């Protein structure tokens, strides 16, 4: 029998044209790398979030090999002032804790401080941001959990924090101006009675776990079995958890495609805990689960028509439902920003996806890639058979529990694969990310696409105002920033990509649409106000402002923010409100950041005003807390670390006051020739940019100066009556006293000078007929635009002609004139620039830091480095740097003493800078071990051996 090939059969006749292997099949679209693996992952387990952006600003993501967790964050680059993603920092404690197990899920808690990491065996470890965004310490080890495949986590949720926050419903245009609707948003339980962290997990085997932290910081756990109708229902694939007013709502999906709904209550015994109660000792609260409702929805499959025909088209075959698998399960709550409260019931949303490579035999019957199946959760009365009415009841007023129902809504189809569904902007927007990298915003209630063109007079979110994500290269995992102004994606190769939301700002087709521009500014303002009220990091908003807005638009945003919060800039009377005002430092911080250029270039004049006010506020609050924590001096002596901080801020406050006086003396000399020509005086004042003059005229900064004087006077008087001090505390307090004693102006004389300025400002307002209702306008002009309003020109004239000359007899003007104020960083002269390039000042302690090798002259640095291969005069040192203002702090560990720790926490400086930006740990740098001289009027801060040893370490 001859072989087939002997007849000379051409192989090309079997497969098509010569040189081609085209089989006549329809061409398939190219899928992103790793998409098939991602869809399989989403199908097999509900908890598979590989990247998460916390509300504190930290981005954590799992490496491509699944063994490490890295963190990044937004930061302002000191060299050029550009906002970028930081370099990645590996979290070594995570790798050690999980011992080689594959990491599958990340989840931040509501404040964005604690991070939960789950591996493929269901083991959970918990970490916390300690002193910087890239400094995370372990709290709970994964070794506490057994290594069991049945313990895999399919659903996870953190307990909310029990605190009421300020929120904003919307912005509506009224008579040409935007009106913002603030209200108080109450938290949704359940809560930990000690206000500690709590984590709820659902496992594959149908076990609900609560990991909670005891008052001593240790973690404990309780667990219970979810009620199931059969054994096969226990094998869960997905679980969605959310806090509601009626308890925790849990939706689960089992391997047999059953959807179960539970309502779980966590009961604590005792319900309250007072750690201050000593006798009798109060036991720690112990939780327990109580199941309230259970509902089973068996039909959770895909029902639909052919995607190439209209909905409900008759006579057309349905697409193959059995091909679809559940790849996502979520519970969507109604918007939290609602002044009437969250009254609408939640929705259950399930994502069903078709296999990536389906059979091509009947392409006309192929369904869409993704189908969104939705159920409305309804509660109604439990209806009984009429015969039950004839049965006598012992309880006439017996209450029947409401029935929990799931009402299926219309399905939503998409020809693209959905890889993520996120509820952003406080529940106002549902963001769905697809496999091609596109992000589409939907209305959570109707699933209608939000395109931003519906109503230009009402703004509820960034998406509704027209912000969108432009098409970019695809990624497999996504997480949105705290205020949804940006997103970070993780691609198939484990690389992160930053994506920013964009807007036309009214510039379309060469024309300007004022309505769209105004709506965009209002949306950014609304997002900023919501972030301030919820104590959320707003660096993503700042990123948009810096990259996309013109200086004029930035000024419009600042004015809107002051009006929306609202902030009354007039503090001529109610000065005590300054100390505890939550929004003033937020606005000052973003003002100062908008004018930052780079580390070596002076800020813009308009931003230098809020920057100086932030420093004055820091010193004022520091002195107030110093006296508060040292009232019981006999039982709680002064802490050396606190006194060192007070010493540095005292020197800074004195030098700042001398700098203000020196500038005013120069201004008085410049304007002396114009004393008889008021018109010329006014014109010259318009062209004068003087930071000290604006600081004195503004009631806000003038009040802070008065608070500082009060604190300095109290410290000076308290030295004689202080409890006996020893060691470093005695040295620091003695230096504080000596610094005040040798000052070229007495504190009472400076207070008298401030009183004269205050009198001149009051007379100017009174002379112009400005009452309390009219004064906020000029005060805002000073603070926001750094301009002297016309109503205060007479006050400037009085200050320069009367108040300043009257002070000359009470000061040592030569000492003030010869002082070196370059270390303050507020002037634009060459001496300040040289100091800025060679030294850093600890922004918290106000103590000059040791110069790093990069700041030393190049020849000296090279000479030191060439000595035997390494420098004998340099040591390694780590510092913290603010991601917003780029200032540094030499502390790289939490305060050691309890008093110092309480002080730093009360000041809000444990994780954040004076400006409100977050800290990041810099890589190790070389610093000079030899002390260098401080500028005139600024003595070198003494560093005790014990403190120096602590500062040398890193967290």
Swiss-Prot record:
Superkingdom assignment: Eukaryota
Chief location of this protein within or outside the cell: nucleus
GO cellular component: mediator complex
Coiled coil: none
Keyword terms: Activator, Nucleus, Transcription, Transcription regulation
Record bears the keyword Nucleus: yes
Region span, Disordered: 855-874
Residue ranges with Polar residues bias: 857-873
Keyword Nucleus in record: yes
Cellular compartments annotated: Nucleus
Biological process terms in GO annotation: positive regulation of DNA-templated transcription
Function: Component of the Mediator complex, a coactivator involved in the regulated transcription of nearly all RNA polymerase II-dependent genes. Mediator functions as a bridge to convey information from gene-specific regulatory proteins to the basal RNA polymerase II transcription machinery. Mediator is recruited to promoters by direct interactions with regulatory proteins and serves as a scaffold for the assembly of a functional preinitiation complex with RNA polymerase II and the general transcription factors.
Name of protein: Mediator of RNA polymerase II transcription subunit 16
Source organism per UniProt: Aspergillus fumigatus (strain ATCC MYA-4609 / CBS 101355 / FGSC A1100 / Af293)
This protein's encoding gene: sin4
